[in-house]
């Protein structure tokens, strides 16, 4: 695969395989279904993957950074690229690709901010002590100051704080995947079922009045089928804060989705759509879509639709927001961006697997930077 191979040769680390596939198709074989007309975008990506030219530089952390080229067309206004802000629980775990806490799940930049003291249990209760509430407000404000285009949370129970979050910022706030419910309900007839998948079916019950208030949708409506994933083999790792073996869980989750759809097939109310409430379910969305042939809405589709409202259509857009983002996600570790005087308030510590991954990333960036600088120096001597 040309683009992926070029990525490996250059030493750059791009974790999102879907992005690599898209870029590969852009550079090699588009086919009769698509056509990429923006040669400038191709030139930028080509320079990113092949050599460090006058449009690129290294940042202080040794990461390869792409600079947008000079805009020679006065009709085009290069806007700041839209980015996402994510409020994180005081809880660290190794996120899978597709999880909200994995930056590689998105095709735009992401800023994270942990709220010290805001544990999963506290979030699930829907009540915040005054000190944690203020830290939550401060975190929303901080993300707003970074210029993010929208804000979400890394847990479905952040729905409890949807009203609080939107009172702090003028940016769009979708604290839970459940915020998509009104659009999903509007799209299907009243005699069709919508399946709501959650980490635990019982945990959604206390939220029903809140969902009705915030989304204008009654979850007690018989058109909703609540599906708990608590008995899916391997998915208990979510509740335990351990790394989820996605490959192991995948067939069981797909089978659960297939069985749920089959149970209602041929009835007066067939299932027409699936919505994943839990932020750790999106890694399975593609497989469930393929198996059921149904649309699957999750926290990633929620964020994408929110950010897409600020992005150009690549066919005829005029701002070319993609020229302003180099494709390298902002580096983040658990506890980053928390003010020094609040770090001691963190209840949890960074997960060992994430520490190891971070150290490996530092070593890779250091090695890549040294190799590129040596290559540049050798080229200069040859001249």
UniProtKB/Swiss-Prot annotation:
Function statement: Mediates cleavage of dimethylsulfoniopropionate (DMSP) into dimethyl sulfide (DMS) and acrylate. DMS is the principal form by which sulfur is transported from oceans to the atmosphere and is a key component of the ocean sulfur cycle.
Keywords from the named record: Lyase
Lineage: Eukaryota, Haptista, Haptophyta, Prymnesiophyceae, Isochrysidales
GO MF entries: dimethylpropiothetin dethiomethylase activity
Originating organism: Emiliania huxleyi (strain CCMP1516)
Enzyme Commission no: 4.4.1.3
Enzyme class, spelled out: lyase
Family of the protein in this entry: Belongs to the aspartate/glutamate racemases family. ALMA1 subfamily.
Listed name of the protein: Dimethylsulfoniopropionate lyase 6
Catalytic activity: S,S-dimethyl-beta-propiothetin = acrylate + dimethyl sulfide + H(+)
Subunit structure: Homotetramer.
Cysteines engaged in disulfide bonds, as pairs: none
Superkingdom, natural source: Eukaryota
């Amino acid at each position: 695969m040309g683009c992926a191979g070029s990525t490996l040769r250059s030493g750059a680390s791009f974790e999102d395989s879907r992005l690599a596939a898209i870029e590969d198709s852009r550079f090699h074989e588009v086919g009769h279904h698509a056509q990429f007309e923006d040669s400038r975008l191709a030139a930028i990506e080509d320079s990113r993957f092949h050599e460090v030219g006058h449009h690129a530089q290294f940042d202080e952390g040794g990461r390869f950074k792409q600079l947008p080229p000079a805009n020679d067309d006065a009709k085009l206004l290069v806007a700041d690229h839209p980015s996402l802000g994510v409020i994180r629980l005081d809880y660290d775990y190794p996120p899978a690709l597709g999880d909200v806490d994995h930056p590689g799940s998105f095709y735009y930049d992401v800023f994270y901010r942990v709220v010290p003291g805001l544990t999963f249990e506290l979030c699930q209760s829907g009540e915040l002590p005054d000190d944690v509430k203020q830290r939550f407000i401060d975190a929303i404000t901080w993300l707003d100051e970074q210029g993010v285009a929208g804000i979400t949370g890394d847990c479905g129970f952040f729905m409890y704080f949807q009203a609080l979050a939107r009172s702090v910022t003028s940016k769009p706030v979708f604290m839970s995947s459940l915020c998509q419910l009104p659009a999903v309900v509007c799209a299907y007839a009243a005699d069709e079922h919508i399946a709501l998948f959650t980490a635990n079916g019982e945990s959604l019950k206390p939220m029903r009045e809140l969902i009705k208030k915030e989304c204008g949708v009654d979850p007690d409506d018989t058109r909703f089928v609540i599906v708990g994933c608590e008995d899916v083999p391997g998915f208990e790792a979510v509740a335990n804060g351990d790394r989820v073996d996605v490959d192991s869980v995948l067939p069981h989750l797909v089978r659960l989705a297939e069985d749920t759809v089959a149970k209602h097939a041929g009835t007066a109310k067939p299932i027409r759509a699936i919505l994943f409430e839990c932020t750790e379910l999106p890694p399975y969305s593609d497989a469930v879509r393929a198996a059921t042939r149904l649309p699957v809405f999750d926290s990633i589709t929620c964020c994408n639709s929110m950010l897409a409202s600020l992005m150009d259509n690549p066919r005829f857009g005029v701002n070319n927001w993609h020229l302003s983002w180099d494709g390298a996600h902002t580096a983040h570790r658990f506890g980053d961006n928390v003010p020094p005087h609040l770090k001691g308030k963190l209840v949890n510590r960074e997960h060992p697997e994430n520490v190891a991954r971070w150290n490996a990333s530092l070593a890779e960036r250091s090695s890549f930077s040294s190799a590129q600088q040596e290559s540049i120096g050798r080229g200069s001597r040859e001249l």
